[in-house]
């Protein structure tokens, strides 16, 4: 129990001052670490004439890939596909990452294009390049244990990323772009619920990322099973709502939404429906779980009038003739237009006005620099406050010792 009223009053005042200083310090540090950012892409119709994605070449790539044979983890076909990708996309810095899982070794292929004026932000495009090791849904029971071609489920996403990679160096971007070809996405166990046996490659990649690398990923965009001649896709559960908001104006501009006008003033086709949400276990899950903003363009109704996860999915009918160059073109244009309009790049929300008064590239760089400057100022205030608190604590300790003496 305290018996001296004067020290009690003094300490109360000191405690109040300490609380104020601590609050100031933590607000400063909190502001430094919690700057608000948002996606603010430019109007897409003004850039639509710049699109150069080659859907015919993408379609030809699917035939070439399936002719390699099943792209199972550790197979010669997989190695040949990876070699072809690296040889054709020389502007990207590629690396392979191998991981042992159960009874096989998977190999991820990661390529990054980083322009000289890069702000450091990174848009990651993801497609699995492995094909399914069994055809468990095939009507012919005698063939269910045989691997499938995987023209749509595997080759279609790879084909789009390859052709996108060819044109990315010409888009005059000011941020990094990573093409992530995942292995062992489609080697999951059927029967029962075994979610962790799917997307092995994506899980392995995310688990080995540094915090700095994750923080620089502004968008992680998966494309899977997007070659169906009867293409349709929706939002996907466990993804970034903010990223989906960027998709709607781009898809509408390209004529992919029947309820919206395209750039020519016509209503589009029923390809993308943002009013619906489907659930699927795929390569977006590990990224989303790690706090990385992720979305997934995936058509889970493969074939004309196909039901969900029905039609040609995981059957021997998943062949190159079921894939459409037009569908590949829609997705390729969607990704390219998103890059051109900076739809998937984060900018500070309090710098919106600046973006309308300067050139787009210069604006992003200026906003980035201003944000860094504000962060450093807030951190400085926080650190000074904490130093003052430390000094006062020492003075209190000295005062207490003096009183006791």
Regions found by a protein language model. Name each.
Residues 55-61, 66-67, 92, 107-182, ...:
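Catalytic-core environment of secreted peptidases
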Residues 47, 60-118, 268:
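A non-catalytic alpha/beta surface segment that caps or lines the substrate-entry region
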Residues 57-67, 76-88, 93, 156-163, ...:
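Extracytoplasmic/secreted proteins, especially bacterial periplasmic and envelope-associated proteins
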Residues 35-82, 305-322:
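N-terminal capping segment at the start of a domain
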Residues 146-250:
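Acidic/histidine-rich catalytic neighborhood of metal-dependent amide-processing enzymes
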Residues 1-40, 351-358, 362-405:
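Secretory targeting signatures
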Residues 71-73, 100-104, 116-118, 129-133, ...:
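Solvent-exposed loop/turn segments at secondary-structure junctions
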Residues 226-350, 358-359, 366-367:
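Active-site-adjacent substrate-binding region
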């Amino acid at each position: 129990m305290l018996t001296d009223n004067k020290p009690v009053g003094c300490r109360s005042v000191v405690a109040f001052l300490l609380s104020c200083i601590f609050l100031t310090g933590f607000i400063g540090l909190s502001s430094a670490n919690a700057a608000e950012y948002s996606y603010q892409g430019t109007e897409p119709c003004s850039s639509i004439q710049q699109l150069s994605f080659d859907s015919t070449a993408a379609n030809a790539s699917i035939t070439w890939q399936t002719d390699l044979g099943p792209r199972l983890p550790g197979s010669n076909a997989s190695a040949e596909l990876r070699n072809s990708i690296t040889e054709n996309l020389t502007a990207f810095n590629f690396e392979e990452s191998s991981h042992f899982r159960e009874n096989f070794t998977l190999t991820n292929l990661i390529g990054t294009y980083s322009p000289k004026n890069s702000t450091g932000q990174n848009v990651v495009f993801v497609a699995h390049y492995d094909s399914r090791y069994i055809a468990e849904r095939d009507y012919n029971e005698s063939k269910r244990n045989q691997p499938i071609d995987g023209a749509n489920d595997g080759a279609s996403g790879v084909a789009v990323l390859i052709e996108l990679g060819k044109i990315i160096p010409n888009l005059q971007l000011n941020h990094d772009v990573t093409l992530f070809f995942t292995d062992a996405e489609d080697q999951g166990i059927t029967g029962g619920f075994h979610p962790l046996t799917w997307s092995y490659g994506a899980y392995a990649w995310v688990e080995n990322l540094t915090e700095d690398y994750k923080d620089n990923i502004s968008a992680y965009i998966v494309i899977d099973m997007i070659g169906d001649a009867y293409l349709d896709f929706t939002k996907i559960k466990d993804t970034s709502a903010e990223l989906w908001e960027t998709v709607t104006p781009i898809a509408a501009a390209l004529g992919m939404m029947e309820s919206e006008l395209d750039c020519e003033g016509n209503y589009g086709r029923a390809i993308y429906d943002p009013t619906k949400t489907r659930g699927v276990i795929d390569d977006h899950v590990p990224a989303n779980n790690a706090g990385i903003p992720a979305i997934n363009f995936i058509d889970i109704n493969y074939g004309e009038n196909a039901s969900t996860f029905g039609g040609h999915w995981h059957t021997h009918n998943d062949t190159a003739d079921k894939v459409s160059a037009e569908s590949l073109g829609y997705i390729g244009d969607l990704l390219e237009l998103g890059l051109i309009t900076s739809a998937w790049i984060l900018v500070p929300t309090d710098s919106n006005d600046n973006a309308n008064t300067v050139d787009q590239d210069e604006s992003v760089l200026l906003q980035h620099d201003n944000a860094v400057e504000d962060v450093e100022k807030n951190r400085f205030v926080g650190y000074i406050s904490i130093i003052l608190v430390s000094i006062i604590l020492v003075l209190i300790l000295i005062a207490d010792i003096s009183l006791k003496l």
